[in-house]
Amino acid sequence: TGIPLIVHTRSAETETLELLKRKKLEKDFKILIHCFTGSRDFAFKLLDLNAFISASGVVTFKKSHELASTFKDIPNNRILVETDSPYLAPVPLRGKTNEPSYIIHTVKFLSELKKISFKEFSKITTNNFFELFGELN
């Protein structure tokens, strides 16, 4: 159908990889890893499957150093951003009910982490969205 498989996984990295690898052998499809909070190793194994990996506000949290480091090294053409509203509001709004307008804080954090402009990173993630989902006509 061309519609990507959207995966939310926690504490099941091995099982998720095994399932995705097995299914990709049967038929190729696009993958989006929603609200990624997994390990660096897991991220790069997902990238080997050409997955897109989405960052939520969690990446901005003070205790998310390892996650931030992982996103710093994920190729720009494989990153998306999301709010996961109404949960996981980014710093500086952590603890509040999340909403779509708060995504700018996650984009700002990641653009600074990757040392590129907010505008450029916004363009990159928008292009990634259309690469994954198509033009949505």
Where do the language-model regions lie?
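Catalytic metal-binding/acid-base residues of hydrolase active sites
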Residues: 10, 52, 86
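Non-cysteine beta-strand/loop elements that form the S-adenosyl-L-methionine
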Residues: 34, 77-85
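His/Asp/Glu-enriched short active-site or ligand-binding loop at hydrolase and phosphoryl-transfer sites
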Residues: 50-64
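Short, conserved catalytic or interaction motifs in soluble domains
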Residues: 76, 90, 111
